[in-house]
Amino acid sequence: APARFSQIFEEPLAEMVEMLQQRGFACALELGSEDVLLTVRAQYIRRILDNIGSNLIKYADPARPIEVRFLRQEGRAGLVFRNHVLPAPPAVESTKVGLTSIETMMDKMHADCKIEQENEQFAMTLLFPVE
């Protein structure tokens, strides 16, 4: 059943931010005021945010804030996560595992996952169909 964006993301996002803050990361959230209706699987959302959180802990530069922003695009809405990566991550392969499982879960929800990396800037966009 469709649920409001705030209902879906509030708790798992708060948990992710708390986990990051405990490890010395600063998070800047811009969630806007538009509360769209999305149909998602709550357990996937939790696991996706868990994965994103642990990726950030491994690869993000703690000296730079992690940005989480609400995004509305045509018939879709979701979140953009942006961070700076530390120079020369030890083993890039391990990020791929987390990213693949995120992409799989997003597929199952008919949602899109886009990953962009430019120099030390990393961005992941999650977009869900709006009801």
Enumerate the predicted regions with their spans.
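Short helix-loop "hinge" at the ATP-lid/N-box region of the Bergerat-fold HATPase_c
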Residues: N55-I57
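Glycine-rich/acidic phosphate-handling loop/turn and adjacent ATP-lid/helix
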Residues: G78-T100
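Conserved catalytic submotifs in the C-terminal HATPase_c
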Residues: Q21, A26-V36, H84
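Conserved micro-motifs of the catalytic ATP-binding
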Residues: A1, L37-V40, A111
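Short beta-strand/loop element within the Bergerat-fold HATPase_c
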Residues: A63-G75
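A conserved beta-strand-to-alpha-helix junction within the catalytic ATP-binding
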Residues: A1-A14
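Glycine-rich ATP-binding loops of the HATPase_c
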Residues: H110-E118
